[in-house]
Amino acid sequence: MTTANSASRPNINVDQAELDKFSALAARWWDPESEFKPLHAINPLRLEWIQELAGSLQGRRVLDVGCGGGILSEAMAQAGADVTGIDLAEKSLKIARLHGLESGVKVEYRAVPVEELATEQAGQYDIVTCMEMLEHVPDPNSVVRACAALVKPGGWVFFSTLNRNPKSFLFAIIGAEYVLRLLPRGTHSYEHFIKPSELAASARQAGLEPSGMRGMEYNPITQIYSLSGNTSVNYLMATRK
């Protein structure tokens, strides 16, 4: 899918195949038993960790980069934040807006590249979240720099992505996509996974200081996700400007 917005921005940092992939699934964003079931399951954990480090979201201005259907955006808004969610998948944003109308949760959604928004609203957000997005774009460093530009001095930027090692290939691709079928086949590309050391270096180069990291684990027997110190597969990184 080439949207009007993406067609007018020929040099934006987007993988069209990735955009098409998520656009095709857009109608199922808010079905907790769909391909997005893992995101629904980990969302409370992500929100709790953000609040644990950054404090109350009440009255805070928050940007959710790569918001998709708005799962995290709505949760942060329900916690009292003034949330803007951005994504380039127009179909996902349409679903996010419709769900917001149904739930009564107010979130502003925009179809704009994070790099473009950084030139418009530099230093205007207390918190920026960029969850499960970096591994889906051609230039993750560009996204990190834009997130750093958008957050206020002293503000927080939270990332989550996948480590790159044999274990993450086995668990995140073979296990999650082919054996347990938690995700559609082809959701992830191993070469786009990012080591924590690489993300930390990118953050520092952008003026962000890594301030905490947690791993995300899944127990296939209990079907429960939890945060842990094991960052070998999925991990979250908190940084501060």
Swiss-Prot record:
Q: Short name of one Pfam family for this protein?
A: Methyltransf_23
User: Which stretches are transmembrane?
Assistant: none
Give all cystine bridges in this chain: none
Q: Name one GO molecular function term.
A: 2-polyprenyl-6-hydroxyphenol methylase activity
Q: Which reaction does it catalyse?
A: a 3-demethylubiquinol + S-adenosyl-L-methionine = a ubiquinol + S-adenosyl-L-homocysteine + H(+); a 3-(all-trans-polyprenyl)benzene-1,2-diol + S-adenosyl-L-methionine = a 2-methoxy-6-(all-trans-polyprenyl)phenol + S-adenosyl-L-homocysteine + H(+)
Q: In which pathway does it act?
A: Cofactor biosynthesis; ubiquinone biosynthesis
Its job: O-methyltransferase that catalyzes the 2 O-methylation steps in the ubiquinone biosynthetic pathway.
Protein name (database record): Ubiquinone biosynthesis O-methyltransferase
The protein's organism comes out as Bordetella avium (strain 197N)
